[in-house]
Amino acid sequence: MPSISTNIILAFITALLGMLIFRSHLMSSLLCLEGMMLSMFILSTLTILSLHFTTSFMMPILLLVFAACEAAVGLALLVTVSNTYGLDYIQNLNLLQC
């Protein structure tokens, strides 16, 4: 396994561990989730380019679209929780009702 792929996989694992360790605040969870998506994007792009998968060139772009949607929904939840309760704890998400 090349060192670049190893570093990207380690970045994904680090972001996953950050997601598991710092799960009390919504902002830190969103940052770790963005780190995971960024490392998945880079790894999928490098894999497609190195293996010459011509039919899969749109997969990293699709992954970026889902990452942008996830970020928008996450920031909307962060603003809603912050305006309602003044804190960004994840446990406050259980109190939100439509």
From Swiss-Prot:
Taxonomy, superkingdom: Eukaryota
UniProt keyword annotation of Iron present: no
An example Gene Ontology biological process: ATP synthesis coupled electron transport
InterPro entries found in the cross-reference section: NADH_UbQ_OxRdtase_chain4L/K, NUOK/Mnh_C1-like
Disulfide bond positions: none
GO cellular component: mitochondrial inner membrane; respiratory chain complex I
Similarity section: Belongs to the complex I subunit 4L family.
Record's function text: Core subunit of the mitochondrial membrane respiratory chain NADH dehydrogenase (Complex I) which catalyzes electron transfer from NADH through the respiratory chain, using ubiquinone as an electron acceptor. Part of the enzyme membrane arm which is embedded in the lipid bilayer and involved in proton translocation.
Name this polypeptide is given: NADH-ubiquinone oxidoreductase chain 4L
